[in-house]
Amino acid sequence: MAPTSKTSPPRLGKPLKRAFFGRSVREVAHDLIGATMLVDGVGGLIVEVEAYHHTEPAAHSYNGPTPRNHVMFGPPGFAYVYRSYGIHWCVNFVCEAEGSAAAVLIRALEPTHGIAAMRRRRHLQDVHALCSGPGKLTEALGITIAHNALPLDRPPIALHARTEDLEVATGIRIGITKAVELPWRYGVKGSKFLSKPFPK
């Protein structure tokens, strides 16, 4: 449950090192659920993600490297930030060995740290809606193209392993028209902070 102004944020788990991201993108996506993501101390629990790999046509990297997606082809453990539909920034974590061009899209957070800052940035009070989508969470955390290619284990970005057991739901990815059958969306089952509920 997200903290209020009268409660303290939950304790943080061990910092995630870049080596964490050198595994299968689907394993990383699953294991990121419940981890804490912070940018300059503002963030929360990762409750929803999607995995992408260059071998499937929904991935930005499917047709090879471009000036936009070149970070995906680099080493694991770095942020890949792009603008979606010319409006919202989206943040991804590069995974697998260099050249694999795989990444995890962060879709939703449960706010736990810096909620006041999130509310100012989003001009919104409802804590459940602050980070319930990839564009919403980047606005709440102040993520822009300036964060592209930054390491995930150094300031301003910090990632911490989950500290509690939880049930991870899986399903098909959202808002794509290709490779729609792949169950590469992961999230906290029953969370009220998702961009969209998982089918029951």
Swiss-Prot record:
Which top class of enzyme applies to this chain?
hydrolase
Please verify whether the record's keywords include Cytoplasm: no
What are the GO BP annotations of this UniProt entry?
Answer: base-excision repair
Q: Does the keyword Flavoprotein apply?
A: no
Which GO MF term does the entry hold, naming one?
Answer: alkylbase DNA N-glycosylase activity
Query: Known EC number(s)?
Result: 3.2.2.-
Alphabetized, the UniProt keywords read:
DNA damage, DNA repair, Hydrolase
Family stated for the protein in its record: Belongs to the DNA glycosylase MPG family.
Q: What is this protein called?
A: Putative 3-methyladenine DNA glycosylase
Organism (species): Bradyrhizobium diazoefficiens (strain JCM 10833 / BCRC 13528 / IAM 13628 / NBRC 14792 / USDA 110)
